[in-house]
Amino acid sequence: MEQRHWKKAGITTSLLGYGCMRLPTLPDGRIDEVRAEALLNTARDAGVNYFDTAYPYHGGESEPFVGRVIAKWPRESFYLATKLPLWQCDSLEKAQQIYRSQFERLGVDTIDFYLLHSLHRARYDQAKALGIVDWLWEEKKAGRIRNFGFSCHDNADGLEHILRDQPWDFCQLQYNYLDTDDRAEEIAGDRGYALTEELGIPLIIMEPIKGGTLANLPPDAAAPLTALDPAASAASWALRWVGSHKNVHLILSGMSAEEQLADNLSTFAPFRPLNAAEDAAVAETARILHSRIKIGCTGCRYCMPCPMGVDIPDNFSIWNRLGMFGQPDAVRHQWTARFPDAEKASHCVRCGKCEAVCPQHLPIRTALAQLQTELDAL
């Protein structure tokens, strides 16, 4: 198992970390604890020593489940990470209440990596004003937290504001070979990665396979990769691309099935950084996927709020997923079962306020009508 050394912390973790957000589930939605525990045990036996959970994962059941599993392991054999859901913390007292409950749910006295969950600039500033950030540094001094950091869903400007404000032990970003542009509202991209390198802040990567979408590529997009290695999975290319960046200390993958775990273990044992030809092939795959985009929305949200309640960027995100990856069944489920009807493109009255402020000068009204027709037809 490939390992990475954390110089400041003086520890060594597996490069692959187990994300406990997408564990296998039963038909009623509860965690399939027999299968999930077997997966975690298999990962640990193969050398994975970092396990990541969070207060809200699996409807609040991930932390207690992980706690029951790790109770059977020697404490020194793994590193545990969890996160504070700041959107549920309107006061320092509420944050402290949740924090204390996490130790009980996990059954531990110390948490190795503690994160402020899903930060953007405004959420960070609020947490700081409430005293939550200073209090957690005190918790680290007391030894209840060993490493203090955050996960971030903001662009590079927002990330830089947060990074430069504290002596963080680490940070966690979404990064993959498609999410390299920092213009989108929630993506720091290449610029965000470069910031962590410049500041010497160890980086943990989430969504290296972009929620699984980079594991199922259309044939034309996969062609540059399969030409070099027909046997390699699409997921392995995405993971190797991320792991080839020198400041990446750990890559999280939310493995929900045995075959996913087996494939990832083979990617990381042994791990092979991309060579020049392989890096060029991944870049060509990314170019092909970007060429299939339906509309060049960057997710900047200058068009929001829509007076009719249409979530314009999220409509475009689903439409672009269909264009880039196909996957009509997955897109249909997202559109019909998970996307609120009140926010769909059908509510557009063509007022044009969105187009007046769009920095990309996109034909938003025409595109909304087209996407509604295409997605409804799935």
Model-derived features: positions:
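N-terminal binding-site loop/beta-alpha segment at the start of enzyme catalytic domains
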Residues: M1-F78, W135, K141
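Conserved, mostly hydrophobic/aromatic
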Residues: W6, Y18, A43, F51, ...
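Short, acidic/polar
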Residues: R30-A43, S91-L106, H153-I162, A234-L239
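Active-site groove signature of glycoside hydrolases
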Residues: F103-Y124
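Beta/alpha (TIM)-barrel catalytic core signal, keyed to glycine-rich beta->alpha loops juxtaposed to Asp/Glu
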Residues: L119-T298, Y302-V310, D314-S317, G326-P340, ...
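Local cysteine-cluster metal-coordination motifs and their immediate loop/turn environment
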Residues: K294-G309, A345-H361
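Short Fe-S-cluster ligation motifs
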Residues: F325-K353, A377-L378
